Amino acid sequence: MAVTSFAKGYCGKMFQDNEQALLKDLLKTDPEFAERFNNFAFDEVINEPEQGLDDRTRFMAILAVLIGSQALDAFNEIAPAALNFGVSAVEIKEIIYQAVAYLGMGRVLPFLNAANKILNARGVKLPLEPQATASTDKNMRRELGTQAQVDIFGENMRDFWKGGHINYWLADNCFGDYYTRKGLDYKQREMITFCFLAAQGGCEPQLTAHAAANMKIGNDKDFLIRVISQCLPYIGYPRSLNALTCVNKACESLQA
């Protein structure tokens, strides 16, 4: 089996100049595997009828699942390609920053370091322009975070922060520190959260809740299935099928 012309062309757009091409070495050492992966990920999946995404959204979702699944080597390959397809440095950083709330700094730090190296190699001046809209004031962060929760999940979240210190931190830290930032809008932030949760596994209740939140703000069921489909080559079938089950459960709960 040879790599299809479409897959070759798509990889050509992904990897420019002297950037390392995904599976380039494997085409020499493991040609049968590499040919099949390239054809599947960079042709069949992308061209599946009614399952596509625009390239920029696809790469944002893929970056999020790579962080969620701790795929640092693949992240180092895909992040430059994402830049080539129009994902901005700010958007990459915002994806990484928000990941801390869902994966913890221990798992995210290697990706932040990797992104800085990639951006430095591209000549991007660091630090980037500030994106925070909330001050460091604890009350302001909580108030703005609560409003973000209400905007996304509904009015039932208005007093959620009163249910103990973890719920307070969810309001002031997870939503107040991250969701209120510029660089990504609510729909993009909920999409990447869905990707973090789907990729890491073991948090299906939260994944179902965020699938419902996505639908409430306009990322409908069909969109989420497209996200799962485009990310499947990177996270595999079990977690993709689990994510699909969560999407179906969320849809059923909203229709009840």
Predicted regions located by residue number:
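Acidic, glycine/proline-rich low-complexity segments that act as flexible tails and inter-domain linkers
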Residues: M1-R56, S69, N76, V108-K187, ...
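Helix N-cap / loop-to-helix initiation motif
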Residues: D54, S88-E91, D185, G218-D222
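Short, structured motif recognition centered on aromatic/hydrophobic residues
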Residues: T57-L66, F75, I95-I96, Q188-A198, ...
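A short structural micro-motif
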Residues: I67, F85, Q98-M105, A198, ...
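Short conserved catalytic/interaction loops centered on acidic-Pro-aromatic/His motifs
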Residues: N76-I78, E204-A212
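Hydrophobic/aromatic-rich structural module bridging two neighboring secondary-structure elements via a short loop
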Residues: I78-A114
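Extended hydrophobic/aromatic segments used for targeting, binding, or gating
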Residues: A209-A211, I217-C231, I235
